[in-house]
Amino acid sequence: MIKFKLAAISAVLMLTLMYSCDYEFIEPPYIEPPQGLSFSEDIIPIFDASCNTSGCHVQGHFAVDLTPENAFSSLFAKDMIDVATPTESRLYVKLNDGNGTHSSRSTAEQRAYILQWIEEGALDN
């Protein structure tokens, strides 16, 4: 009888914990990027917020160094940008793969900014 009560209490506790830990991520509203994006003013802040933090894409760690002083040259040296077909740029594809941490670390708005910057010629401005 004691085992039954203990099992029942455990089951109720587990169900309570399972259903009380629900988190719904709310995606911020999409804002159309402005024309004439600047690499230093519009793209670098995206990398600073989500890519080159916690030792991810910093100098000496991963293939692409996205720190402000090295990001532009690293993106082109590692063939991450394709201005002829922007949606096939390795950077854009990586951000939209849906399988890894890359897509979860950026918003739809940030990905749209990066795509537009590539479409505008991926200038170092």
Predicted regions located by residue number:
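Aromatic- and Gly/Pro-enriched helix-to-coil junctions and flexible linker segments
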Residues: C21-N125
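Sec-dependent bacterial lipoprotein signal peptides
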Residues: M1-C21
